[in-house]
């Protein structure tokens, strides 16, 4: 069995001959890549637990083999969000948070779209811009009422 060599810290003079730089040269390249550090690790880990639950129940990466229907994952995400909205934080089947289920399901849906095996069974859509139009109407109502307090 090979013995590990003890860690030896470099002498303070080791890098003395090198020119001091404001930043590591690799920073210039690294900051131009997709930033992953802003994604909250605890939420990603919750999603990992939800994915594990799904893997054990349906098989790992089952959607990449069988594909998905958009409506099934949309409906599931809304059910989880509605359960949470109505006060149920934890999914009784998995024991994990409903929001983590919604995020994970939407991630699977998006992955299936990117993978090319998603059946897009959405209904025919309204004209583009209808959400913006409705938001503008809501804003106009608020302006007209002189009441800018949220209605709850």
Predicted features, each with a name:
Residues 1-152:
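Intrinsically disordered, low-complexity regulatory regions
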